[in-house]
């Protein structure tokens, strides 16, 4: 009799376990009713949004086959596994010469082992080069300052990146006298009191050379150099920083990294992109534009009668992926954050969650990033393709967020692999953007 009772209890437990798993199966929705089933799959502060009914998202399947790279990328990654290593500064270098290559295509470190003491920084370099692979870009986008109930303020931004490495080589400048990785400029288009404000950055390959940063403020009518530590500060007073970028845009060598582990996780993705609804349009001067069909329903404040927090992702869905979890501590003690925790997809190497802590260990900010599948540009080139842009920096202490990614109204640039001239990024002429 006792044996029979134990068997019945075991069967009941298995049935309950099976039902719990079914609740998080593809096609179901994660919300208040079943959020506890995701407690080991999400950062606690994100899980809390689902438990409170502030976030609600469908769960979708994201097979590895949904993400493909350019022709030749896999072969280049395989060669990197043979030829690249890290030097003492943790930059990628050629094994034979101990010098950084002029050009790297593919994942610098395609073979990651958990027992490798350098695993974390190798994962990060793969993540960074995944961004570089996307190529030169220009995006006219909106930053939204959002309270739990509404949009408080907006700023239009015209953001341009030029990459000297990582992207297909014919898109990069033919010469690189400053030995740069990339150049970046952000021009504020609106509101009127900020119009003409510009921020410019140069990232050098030399691990000992800090980023060069300049800012132009029209009311001051001059260009001034800015400390690299300021890249962690809120951009235009928002909760988003320059070091956030696509996911993490800090210089890897400026941090000390360790691997926390590899785990299952839920991350945000684009269900319509997975369904093949991405639109690519070739541009007359070269490159491609990807208009956002879900631009007007990206986050809660845009949707009539939305019941969750105003910055909640609406067009996005959740998908279960394997992720690497990394921890970085800045070497510069003037850096705003004392620790950064990054969750990175272990196949696509796109970022999912970027958690930032104070020097005392308190969680301050969580950067929530969408990881869509790839979509083709042409028969041989492909990269991330989406129907909306959603990157949200949530200030968990102040209960507010900054949403980045939605495009400004009209047929505005959301462009990649476009031709760009290095002269566009000259700090001596930054004041040309002044109103």
Predicted regions and their residues:
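Bacterial N-terminal signal peptides
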Residues: 7-15
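Solvent-exposed N-terminal domain segments of exported/luminal and surface proteins
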Residues: 23-211, 217
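Feature captures eukaryotic membrane-trafficking machinery centered on endolysosomal pathways
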Residues: 324-358
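Sec/Tat signal peptide C-region and signal peptidase I cleavage site
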Residues: 16-22
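Short, hydrophobic/aromatic-rich segments at coil-to-beta transitions
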Residues: 179-185, 211, 319-327, 350-354
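Bacterial N-terminal signal peptides that target proteins for export
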Residues: 1-7
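Short, surface-exposed coil-to-beta transition loops
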Residues: 195-198, 209-210, 335-340, 352, ...
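Non-transmembrane domains of secretory- and envelope-associated proteins
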Residues: 22-111, 231-313, 320-322, 358-435
């Amino acid at each position: 009799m006792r044996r029979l009772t134990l068997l019945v209890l075991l069967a009941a437990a298995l049935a309950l376990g099976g039902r719990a798993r079914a609740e998080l199966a593809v096609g179901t929705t994660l919300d208040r009713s079943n959020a506890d089933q995701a407690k080991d799959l999400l950062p606690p502060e994100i899980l809390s949004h689902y438990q409170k009914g502030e976030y609600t998202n469908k769960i979708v399947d994201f097979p590895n086959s949904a993400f493909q790279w350019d022709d030749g990328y896999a072969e280049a990654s395989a060669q990197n596994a043979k030829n690249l290593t890290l030097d003492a500064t943790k930059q990628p270098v050629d094994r034979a010469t101990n010098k950084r290559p002029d050009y790297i295509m593919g994942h610098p470190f395609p073979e990651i082992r958990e027992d490798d003491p350098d695993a974390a920084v190798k994962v990060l370099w793969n993540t960074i080069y995944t961004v570089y692979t996307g190529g030169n870009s220009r995006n006219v986008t909106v930053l939204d300052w959002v309270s739990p109930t509404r949009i408080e303020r907006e700023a239009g931004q015209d953001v341009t990146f030029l990459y000297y490495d990582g992207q297909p080589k014919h898109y990069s400048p033919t010469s690189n006298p400053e030995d740069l990785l990339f150049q970046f400029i952000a021009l504020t288009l609106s509101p009127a009191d900020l119009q003409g404000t510009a921020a410019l950055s140069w990232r050098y390959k030399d691990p000992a050379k800090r980023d060069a940063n300049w800012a132009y403020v029209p009311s001051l009518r001059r260009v001034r150099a800015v400390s690299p530590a300021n890249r962690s500060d809120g951009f235009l007073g928002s909760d988003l920083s320059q070091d956030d970028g696509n996911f993490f845009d800090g210089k890897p060598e400026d941090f000390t990294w360790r691997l926390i582990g590899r785990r299952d996780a839920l991350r945000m993705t684009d269900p319509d992109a997975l369904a093949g609804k991405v639109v690519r349009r070739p541009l007359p001067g070269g490159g491609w534009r990807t208009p956002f069909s879900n631009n007007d329903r990206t986050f809660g404040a845009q949707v009539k009668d939305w019941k969750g927090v105003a910055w909640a992702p609406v067009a996005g869905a959740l998908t279960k992926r394997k992720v690497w979890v990394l921890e970085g501590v800045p070497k510069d003690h003037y850096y705003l954050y004392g620790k950064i925790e990054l969750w990175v997809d272990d196949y696509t190497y796109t970022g999912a969650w970027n958690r930032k802590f104070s020097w005392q260990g308190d969680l301050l900010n969580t950067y929530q990033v969408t990881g869509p599948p790839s979509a083709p540009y042409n028969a041989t080139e492909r990269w991330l393709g989406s129907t909306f842009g959603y990157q949200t920096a949530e200030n968990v202490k102040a209960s507010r967020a900054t949403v980045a990614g939605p495009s400004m109204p009209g047929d505005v640039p959301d462009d990649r692999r476009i031709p760009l001239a290095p002269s566009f990024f000259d700090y001596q002429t930054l004041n040309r953007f002044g109103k």
